[in-house]
Swiss-Prot record:
SUPFAM superfamilies for this protein: PSPTO4464-like (SSF158710)
Protein name per the record: Dual-action ribosomal maturation protein DarP
Single GO BP term: assembly of large subunit precursor of preribosome
A GO cellular component annotation in the UniProt record: cytosol
Predominant cellular place of this UniProt entry's protein: cytoplasm
Top-level lineage group: Bacteria
Described purpose of this protein according to its UniProt entry: Member of a network of 50S ribosomal subunit biogenesis factors which assembles along the 30S-50S interface, preventing incorrect 23S rRNA structures from forming. Promotes peptidyl transferase center (PTC) maturation.
Keyword rRNA-binding on entry: yes
Organism per entry: Xylella fastidiosa (strain Temecula1 / ATCC 700964)
One GO MF term attached to the UniProt entry: ribosome binding
Family membership: Belongs to the DarP family.
Amino acid sequence: MWKNGAMRGCNKETGEFLGPSRSQQRRTALEVLVLSEKLAALTPAQLAKLPIPERLLPHITETKRITSHIARKRQLAFLAKQMRREDDTTLEAIREKLNASGIQAQREVATLHRTEQWRKRLLEEGDSALTELLNQYPQADCGKLRQLLRNSKTEQARNKAPQAFRELYQVLHGLIITQNSDNQHQTPQ
């Protein structure tokens, strides 16, 4: 019996097939297998953020524990089978939440890259890049940034520990995150 209660077959009155075709069943099974692989690759903290039913968590944990290739493949197939027994809305909710967290991770990486680009530009170009930064981020503390730039250059020249270099990154990261929370994405050119 299928989830909708109909057996695969043909409606005698209309001639239409009941239930999904075998090809559709295979595609669905493959999609669920891919989803199970993604779930098995997540950390426990990431799994906790997803709307996963309690009865699937032991299977996911068991899959993560197995290291043997063939045994892991078999366990992934079993996990996918257990997931196919779940309601379609449950699987869709897991997919949506997983995609949303992936998008959030991409945004965080983009913010880190933007911060690194600004730090590099400030150290290479000096005052011209600082002026542009202050135009894009008017809330920035000009004196603090100048001091951190000076100290970073001094540290590099003397081969000292990059304390000001790291602090400059933290200050820039704070500026960019504050700006991003206001939904005004600016990137250096």
